[in-house]
Swiss-Prot record:
This is Arginine biosynthesis bifunctional protein ArgJ. Catalyzes two activities which are involved in the cyclic version of arginine biosynthesis: the synthesis of N-acetylglutamate from glutamate and acetyl-CoA as the acetyl donor, and of ornithine by transacetylation between N(2)-acetylornithine and glutamate. InterPro entries: Arg_biosynth_ArgJ, ArgJ-like_dom_sf, ArgJ_beta_C. Belongs to the ArgJ family. The record marks 109-110 as: Involved in the stabilization of negative charge on the oxyanion by the formation of the oxyanion hole.
């Protein structure tokens, strides 16, 4: 049920004609209350798409009555006209639903540098409104796909309240956040500050640690909407954990559907002096293309792990580093460890542990291997 699992929400997904292949490309999520609150996290890319700039302003009000999302065009790097189109989209949603346009968030995903076909999008909004349903979450999740092969949803149900969510993303997955659009909903009765604390804590250890290809999008948007319909106010810790669980599940689905990937790689850094050190090392390993190619070839090349660690500013002694691949400590104290032939890499999941032997802090980054399919898909993306 995705975003409609929580009480107080309706959603829809339709084909407005934005995509040339005729697939669904316009989603709408509406918060029917009774007590609305919202929080959001956006890309840290300095080049921000028009819908990101618009939605950042909307979130300052702390209330989001509706979110309209299109796939098939990012509306990024489109100048003043692109922002005008975003404004017009919000106005159309507001007019059709009798809302305030300043409470309508907008999100877009697709090719950068191309204006959206507003002659198709605006009539599509009317059809999306007509299709709103308490069971429309799956259709909405399908409509935001781009190169995704599957739609991504998640739900956590607690004692009298629920957190649900949908996500899209398959390429340009990198910290800050990852080419992804995410809408989370809850019927818990919470204010914007409680939502903001929970969302930022969740994204820090989930979406921000998904690093499929090291490319940061212009459009990343994660929204958390509360309706208050359950009339239950959970403890902050319990709510934050539910949001984290949904984000973690969606993040894993993003990695599993990464473009062209044949291996899902969990990079776990342990024994770091600080968490920042652990994250920096994890990112360096996850972004090492030589290592990603080796993993694709089922080669447990621990030397490339050490090489990646060595490019960081983290505290460690080279002769104290240890590396395990799928449970085999192939590197011990900076040199040869157990027999690398013992490493079984036949399966999709690959687990790398890098022990810095410099402290007690840890961090985990998720990435993928680098394949010919990834290169092919992205070399032909705009053609």
């Amino acid at each position: 049920m995705s975003v409609t699992a929580a009480q107080g929400f309706t959603a829809s997904g339709i084909a407005a004609g934005i995509k040339e292949n005729g697939n669904p490309d316009l989603a709408l999520v509406v918060n029917n209350g009774p007590r609305l609150a919202a929080a959001g996290v956006f890309t840290s890319n300095r080049v921000k798409a028009a819908p990101v700039l618009w939605s950042e302003q909307v979130l300052k009000g702390g209330v989001v009555s509706a979110v309209v999302l299109n796939s098939g065009g990012a509306n990024a790097c489109t100048g003043p006209k692109g922002f005008q189109d975003t404004h017009a989209t919000a106005e159309k949603v507001a007019e059709t639903l009798d809302l305030n346009a300043g409470e309508v968030a907008v999100a877009s995903t697709g090719l950068i540098g191309v204006l959206l076909p507003m002659d198709k999008l605006l009539p599509g909004v009317e059809r999306a409104v007509a299709g709103l349903s308490e069971h429309g979450g799956e259709k909405a999740a399908i409509a935001i796909k781009t190169t995704d092969t599957v739609h991504k949803t998640s739900v956590v149900t607690k004692d009298g309240w629920t957190v649900g969510g949908m996500a899209k993303g398959a390429g340009m997955l990198a910290p800050g956040l990852a080419t992804m659009l995410v809408v989370l909903t809850t019927d818990a009765d919470l204010d914007r500050d409680a939502l903001d604390r929970a969302l930022r804590a969740a994204t820090r250890t989930t979406f921000d640690r998904v690093d499929s290809d090291g490319c940061m999008s212009t459009n990343d948007t994660v929204l958390l909407l509360a309706s208050g319909a359950s009339e239950v106010t959970p403890k902050q810790e319990e709510f934050a954990e539910a949001v984290r669980a949904v984000c973690d599940d969606l993040g894993q689905q993003l990695i599993q559907d990464a473009e062209g990937a044949s291996k899902d790689i969990k990079v776990e850094v342990v024994g770091a002096a600080t968490e920042d050190d652990a994250v920096e090392v994890g990112r360096s390993i996850a972004r090492n293309n030589l290592l990603k190619c080796a993993i694709h070839g089922e080669d447990p090349n621990w030397g490339r792990v050490l090489s990646a660690i060595g490019t960081t500013r983290a505290a460690f002694e080279p002769d104290q580093l240890n590396v395990a691949i799928n449970g085999v400590w192939v590197c011990k104290k900076g040199g040869v460890g157990e027999d690398r032939d013992l490493v079984d890499m036949r399966y999709r999941e690959v687990h790398i542990v890098a022990d810095l032997a410099a402290g007690t802090e840890t961090a985990t980054i998720w990435t993928n291997d680098l394949t010919a399919d990834y290169v092919h898909e992205n070399s032909a993306y705009s053609s």
